[in-house]
Amino acid sequence: MNVVDTIKNAAFASAIQAALKYMDKDPETNIPKVMSIVDKAAPEGWYAGQRNAIRQGIAEKGNWYELATKVWALDPEVRKTFFTNFIVNASLKGSALQKETEEKEDCNVPWAILLDPTSACNLHCTGCWAAEYGHKLNLSLETIDDIITQGKKLGTYMYIYTGGEPMVRKKDIITICERHPDCEFLSFTNGTLIDEEFCQEMLRVKNFVPAISLEGFETANDGRRGPGVFEKVKHAMQLLKAHNLPFGISTCYTSANYKDITSEEFYDMIIEAGALFIWFFHYMPVGNDAAPELMPNPEQRTAVYERIRAFRSSKPIFSLDFQNDAEYIGGCIAGGRYYLHINAAGDVDPCVFIHYSNANIHEVSLLDALKSPIFQAYRKGQPFNDNMLRPCPMLENPECLPKMVKETGAHSTDPQSPEDVQHLCDKCKPYAEAWTKMADKLWDERLDAKK
């Protein structure tokens, strides 16, 4: 039986569920039994390295063990739903169906779909690329429901809300969670609209996780987002922690804040607040009014790269670095390879940062959008660089995106101020040239370390 058939096999899903029951009874004692069940049920070679790393981390009772105990302290029903939806449905069953669909249809099929429920926001943050879309666009409840229904048929069970501020649509977000209890939903949010009532709704539906945006400490955060926002975020985190609900932090690193958000003090603050993960994003000069000077220089990006990796081996929090972690997933993940983005107007973009498209979800099916010219160009071009520290066709390889956009006839999907693709990528050229030397050095060191 091949990997796809094994993962789709009901016995494999049953083995995972049995493992979770063991953990519920006595997590510390039964972890070895759980690993044994997974080993016996898994296809040969399936995530072998990761399974060994988990085993080692648990045996040493270090930061990964501490993180595991925090996960097991979550509300039991929320935890059970997360493991079922995220591990069994999205990462096992879903991945197998994605692979099958990809081979059959000759197109990328995403592990996750990013959606903008609305372009509206209750804040007016300085330099926000999402603000380029204005505040009047919305995907209807039925459109979101239909996208997810289509996505599940392709094998996609993970959905991530961006914006705008998704929590402006709190009621509809909960309705979607109810309609699709087999999916896991994550939302990037400024956190100011999370209250006691919404926490109770999260406990009820069980399949929603917020990723709260923080730009650093109070001065930096409120300087960009407005006075009092930091305190509102702290209150939201206190509520989530009190209800044993999972949440994480999202942060954009720039030349101005990179030291603060990779400091031990910042890490310790969010860990104490109850965050289970932190997702780092590199500042992208998207939009006609972007500020290229906020892009970190090579030394600053390297500092971020090194600090995140250091804390991965010492802090009980899962750290993701969107730009510097490409080696773990083979380069650029956009264009439907692992994810795509649908904005509040329905335009299907290859990336949340790259707003050029041939398709609108109101006019074509999700599958047809994945077969559209710009998505096929991504499929053909990936990876855009053999150096996994230079994954993006815009930021690190600015010669690639204009070529794809022009050859496919894709148009700008920014309704407020459409940006010419050459204008966008010209802003990235000095950065790419400066980063290449450092990236090559770091990548060579990384390859040598693996030998």
Roles of regions detected by a PLM:
Residues 2-7, 11, 15, 22, ...:
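Flexible mid-to-C-terminal extensions adjoining Fe-S/redox cofactors in radical SAM and related proteins
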Residues 131-135, 217-219, 285-288:
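A short, flexible beta-alpha/helix-coil linker loop
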